[in-house]
Amino acid sequence: MSRLQTRFAELKEQNRAALVTFVTAGDPDYDTSLAILKGLPKAGADVIELGMPFTDPMADGPAIQLANIRALGAKQNLTKTLQMVREFREGNSDTPLVLMGYFNPIHKFGVERFIAEAKEAGVDGLIVVDMPPEHNSELCDPAQAAGIDFIRLTTPTTDDARLPKVLNGSSGFVYYVSVAGVTGAGAATLEHVEEAVARLRRHTDLPISIGFGIRTPEQAASIARLADGVVVGSALIDHIANATTPDQAIDGVLSLCSALSEGVRKARVS
């Protein structure tokens, strides 16, 4: 079993959802970002999504766009992001880590080289938002052949006719974007999320993680009662944006992560 499969299976046994945290690699700088990354598991993150900075993050809202700008301004690139994963793995061999981003930097790096280095560094999965299933042979298939899960995004506009195609070749978990649009947008209604999870379960046995718009422990707990995973990104990144020192950024992110984790862990306790 992959690290992702193992983690979701363990949490299912414990009857709780996973807290999936997203941060952008190199935001606000390499050392601060690495310290945050290393601190997330102890603060309660069950799965980590690490953003690969890109100049045109079209699916992301303002908070993550600015995180990309800060990271690129600090000279973060794909080579450094993979090095960050290696350094994270020196002290952590069990927390699943997923790289999230866009195809352009991977294409420039070289797909074959990227997959080989990602696997060697300890990457467990990929979310590449601009690679539809029609292009599985370009990245999804070779990644999975190397043992790296390929995680798909589904949205409220992904209808029943399209879903099987989107889920074709998916592994690890399914990431449901609960609000159509860009990341960090308003939270979806719980009724809508419940219906969406039920619909997805008719099409897949993979764990379902819900993201976009979750900012508080209370919201995280509400989603944790319905889904297998709760994804939080923009709310964490806001702490980096608003910090005036590296320590303030680290403490802000990890404090919120701990509070979110507590919300998720208590969600299904009756």
Curated annotation (Swiss-Prot):
One Gene Ontology term, aspect cellular component: cytosol
GO molecular function: tryptophan synthase activity
UniProt-listed CDD domains: Tryptophan_synthase_alpha
EC number: 4.2.1.20
Function: The alpha subunit is responsible for the aldol cleavage of indoleglycerol phosphate to indole and glyceraldehyde 3-phosphate.
Record family assignment: Belongs to the TrpA family.
Subunit description: Tetramer of two alpha and two beta chains.
Protein name: Tryptophan synthase alpha chain
The species this protein was found in: Pseudomonas fluorescens (strain Pf0-1)
Gene from which the chain derives: trpA
